[in-house]
Each structure stands twice: as C-alpha cells, then as structure tokens.
C-alpha cells in the first residue's frame, strides 16, 4: 500500500510541472507579431495601430517585428519554426491561401501548420487607369480590352500577391486577354501607371489617395464599396457579379498553441477592433475591421484555397 502511494505521489510530482505549464498565466512576457513585409505598408499599419491596445488589455507589450523577403516566406518560416508558446504570431495575408499554386518551394499547409486566432480586416484594391485610356468606367474598359486582345497591359507585384490574383480573376470573368507586367514594388508600378506605360493597376487605397489627380479609379475589388472612396463602384456592380478579391489580414501562430491562449488573444483582438478610435483610423485608411472566431478564420482560408485553386487552373498556372 505504502509503495503504491509513493509511486502515485512520485507520478503526481512529475506531472505537476506539465500541468502548471498548461495553465500558466499568459502572457507573462512581451509578444511579437511578425510582419513578413517592410515597415510602412498596410501590414505594418494594422499591427502597430493595434499593439498598444492589446498591451493595455493583456498586460504585456505587443511588438511588431518586420521580417520581409522572399515573397513573405522569411517571416512565415520564422513563425512556423517558433515554439507554440503564444509569444510569436504572424500577421497573415489572404495571399497565403494561394501560395502553393504559384511557388513550388512552399512547403507549409495553412490549415495544418498554423493556429488560427482571428481575422482582422479587409482592404479593397482600386483599379487605376491612366487618364489617356479611353474608358470612363469598367464596362467601357472591358469593351476596349475585348477589341484589342493581347494588347492591353496591367501591373502586378509578382505572382501570388493579391493584385496578381485580382487581375487573373478580372481577366477571366471579363473574358479579356491582357499582358501582365510584374514590378518589384507598388512605387515602381505606380510610376508606370502614372506615365501611361501600363494601362491599369490594382492598387491599395493609399496609392489612389496620393495620386487622385493623375489617375482614374474605375472600380474596387471588394464586394462592397470602400468607406474611403464610396463614389468608386465595385467590380461586381459594374458588370461582373460575384467578383470579390480584396486584401485581407489575420493573426495566426504556429500549430499547437494552447486553446486558452488563442481564446484570450482572440477576445482582445475583438475588443480592440470594436474601439471607436481604432475603427475610425482604420476606416480612414480604407481598412474595414472584421474580427472573427478561430473557426471562422479556418473556414475562410479553406474557401480561399479552393478559390485560388480554381483561378490557377483556369489560368493554366504552374508553381515555379
């Protein structure tokens, strides 16, 4: 009896550290959010805006750490290889759902290798054309492009980015043939749109805001009009019903993060995105706050993986 009791106590003592670790308070040190893009962009804006509020709610610093490069894979890999302790998260974009269709070196599975936390926001892209393009609206542009198959050009930021997918979907639904001109940065693409060297570019809100006098916005890629420029119609209402290809962002961590950590961070994100000052700043920047449950985020990624797969198949894309 004594031997059995001693063995039970020994087992309990061994198990206690693990049990304690599973229920330990979180966070008890700063939390980092990896942004797989350079400072100063839309990704950076969202995390830096939210960080002070998350710190107030959860009692620890939330630090934005920019890790750009290799189309986002440097930052993504860093998070994948981080311990699932709740102190490293990724600002994940919707484009991750389509990465495997264009990049043969992508080894991760979004649904298997990441822990979903919360959806954050939706940001439309604006279809910008040079004023010399003789099309005042989307229907006129489609008619123009159909009359010149293979001659119209459009700027993208390389295979796999949302403007790339937005253009492929647009060309397919509009039944037009156009030439993709890839650029390394938004700035370079914008210069060529402003000069008329390319015909159109799906650009973020900030690009249109800074160049309204020099370009024409004929449509936005989201299902609803932007709060920033509500006068610009959606592609869907301009003749291509069902079109919807905005940028969207979420927070994810490496696979295996404790459920209570996910629940705490998810609740803090929802509260932050509901704060009037946060909502106002995001809306003014053309970003629509849209929190979610982890389950809703998983469902959205699954749906977009299928969407990108269909677009890739129709376009004949092969991973490079």
Feature map (PLM): residue ranges:
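A short C-terminal helix-loop "cap" of Rossmann-like NAD(P)-dependent dehydrogenase/epimerase domains
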Residues: 28, 55-59, 174, 227, ...
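An extracytoplasmic/periplasmic, membrane-proximal ligand-sensing/linker region
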Residues: 28-30, 173-176, 259-320
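N-terminal (or domain-start) structured segment
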Residues: 21-112, 151, 159-162, 173-202, ...
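Structural signal for conserved beta-strand scaffold positions within catalytic alpha/beta enzyme cores
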Residues: 66, 91, 116-119, 156, ...
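Short, low-complexity disordered leader/linker segments with a strong preference
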Residues: 1-28, 320
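C-terminal lobe and pocket-closing loops
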Residues: 122, 206-274, 303-306
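Hinge/capping helix and adjacent helix->loop/strand transition within the periplasmic-binding protein
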Residues: 81-87, 101-188, 235, 248-281
